[in-house]
UniProtKB/Swiss-Prot annotation:
GO terms for biological process: translation. HAMAP family: Ribosomal_uL5_B. The keyword Ribosomal protein applies. It comes from Streptococcus pyogenes serotype M49 (strain NZ131). NCBIfam families: PRK00010.1. Belongs to the universal ribosomal protein uL5 family. This is Large ribosomal subunit protein uL5. The keyword Hydrolase does not apply. Keywords: Ribonucleoprotein, Ribosomal protein, RNA-binding, rRNA-binding, tRNA-binding. GO terms for cellular component: ribonucleoprotein complex; ribosome. Part of the 50S ribosomal subunit; part of the 5S rRNA/L5/L18/L25 subcomplex. Contacts the 5S rRNA and the P site tRNA. Forms a bridge to the 30S subunit in the 70S ribosome.
Amino acid sequence: MANRLKEKYTNEVIPALTEKFNYTSVMAVPKVEKIVLNMGVGDAVSNAKNLEKAAAELALISGQKPLITKAKKSIAGFRLREGVAIGAKVTLRGERMYEFLDKLVSVSLPRVRDFHGVPTKSFDGRGNYTLGVKEQLIFPEISFDDVDKVRGLDIVIVTTANTDEESRELLKALGMPFAK
């Protein structure tokens, strides 16, 4: 069964963007390439259990096993040594990516307290969008009772768009609730 958001992209978004930006080929229309979820766990330096919990939560949210990230260099101020595990990340592509984006837009973001839309200034100039989530509780897979500590995560949506405007239109057409 094809994903609801992927069908919407094929049937509605491609024709709309082709008309707006006058693309000559269907392949020129921007699409979502991948979504990267990153959870930096700074307190994992002193307590490795925190990193395990964070990785387990990230696995629940994304549906795949996270990659443990390690410190690239030592920083004495943070009591950090090179090679120490300090975070977890997941790269979603294909079906899982569309499922996650659909869930993020329709279920998770509306659960954020005092939500007025995601900021429009978080584009990087190359058509990629970054979103910070302050608490992992907005995702339906995370049970309130199982959470030992509120952790945030970064969500990076990488698109094939060349400009921020094209990327914004793509995400808006896919249902991303941008702030007015």
